Amino acid sequence: MSIVVKNNIHWVGQRDWEVRDFHGTEYKTLRGSSYNSYLIREEKNVLIDTVDHKFSREFVQNLRNEIDLADIDYIVINHAEEDHAGALTELMAQIPDTPIYCTANAIDSINGHHHHPEWNFNVVKTGDTLDIGNGKQLIFVETPMLHWPDSMMTYLTGDAVLFSNDAFGQHYCDEHLFNDEVDQTELFEQCQRYYANILTPFSRLVTPKITEILGFNLPVDMIATSHGVVWRDNPTQIVELYLKWAADYQEDRITIFYDTMSNNTRMMADAIAQGIAETDPRVAVKIFNVARSDKNEILTNVFRSKGMLVGTSTMNNVMMPKIAGLVEEMTGLRFRNKRASAFGSHGWSGGAVDRLSTRLQDAGFEMSLSLKAKWRPDQDALELCREHGREIARQWALAPLPQSTVNTVVKEETSATTTADLGPRMQCSVCQWIYDPAKGEPMQDVAPGTPWSEVPDNFLCPECSLGKDVFDELASEAK
């Protein structure tokens, strides 16, 4: 069944209430989706996009109920991905000579999916127009890498409707088509989820492309997206949100996520969160176990956050696989203006936290001090985790902290013995980690104030796991 969008524009798309996976299994569409196709009937009849390939036959049959297929004069393909152009083969089998208007890159993508180079392709570029009669034109705007190289938008003069492709859309299924008809909380939650998980890597392109489109000085009464609602009520509100999200977006929020084998790393996460909340009660803190949480919700929270803490147990000297996979995905999303800290527990040897810190730094995060615990953290170790959270809260504060938290008393780390009496600091000759007698190494039950001579012989360097024999007196303190 078609829905009138405006005047002679009809929605002829497909709702998909059941879909739960998108882009393979990388995006969870918890509220379904829609594949929006539009039929414009003027002196010339234009079809903008089709639907997902799994609905090809149903789409063509429904379209035949709306219009004699032979009366379709032009097909516009804003994007060649299968959820947009998937029904082309089924449709073109009925009307093989119908002109297809798309970008040059789209021809490559369409042929790659459908293998019909004989189709009547017509390449368009930014500023090109197509007269469709009754004084109306289609104006094409290339939008490469938002989010594919072939992407473009199409603007209809007279009706002032922007067919925006993936931009401004959301994977959200509802019987109502327009933004003012649906649950606003659900809608904007899905808009942000969509941007965070799909468009974040291209944020540097969003602002100049929107500026370019606004530079045409064309009125926009509606934005007709490829997924989700049509924006008819104050359509520029979603444009303003995109400009905000593209500008290195962050809220006063910290996301903590982890994976754990024996709940030790979970205990650390809880204690760190307590320290953050104790020091800065204004900050929102969200905690996720990656094995039990929706990955896209985690990534959306990272997008919203000023920083994140990532925890992992050590398994075979490396991080847990789910954490490794999530870090790889964040590398591709190219988050900006975010801070990060790694933490985790280990047994006889470590390695995961250092590896995780390196990977997070490579992913573009500004790194803060990491934290490790050996075996199951006891009360002293948990207090160190809380203190780590307090320090993170202080370092990452976006505004001066409330005075009551600035003066929080922190447990003294050094004994009454003077630093000089404790002897020199010792440095690992392999990884350069420094043992400070004044601080000790509580994770290995070496109390603050323990001189090197009293450190147990089974002590291991926290960074490289080698023994005491690789340590030398710190050069700057050698006599």
Curated annotation (Swiss-Prot):
Pathway: Nitrogen metabolism; nitric oxide reduction
PROSITE patterns associated with the record: FLAVODOXIN_LIKE, RUBREDOXIN_LIKE
GO CC, one annotated term: cytoplasm
Cofactor comment: Binds 3 Fe cations per monomer. Binds 1 FMN per monomer.
Region (Zinc metallo-hydrolase): 30-210
Domain of life: Bacteria
Cofactor(s) of this protein: Fe cation; FMN
Cell compartments where the protein resides: Cytoplasm
Binding locations of Fe cation 1: H79, E81, H147, D166
Assembly: Homotetramer.
Family: In the N-terminal section; belongs to the zinc metallo-hydrolase group 3 family.
Biological function: Anaerobic nitric oxide reductase; uses NADH to detoxify nitric oxide (NO), protecting several 4Fe-4S NO-sensitive enzymes. Has at least 2 reductase partners, only one of which (NorW, flavorubredoxin reductase) has been identified. NO probably binds to the di-iron center; electrons enter from the NorW at rubredoxin and are transferred sequentially to the FMN center and the di-iron center. Also able to function as an aerobic oxygen reductase.
Protein name as it appears in the record: Anaerobic nitric oxide reductase flavorubredoxin
Organism: Escherichia coli (strain SMS-3-5 / SECEC)
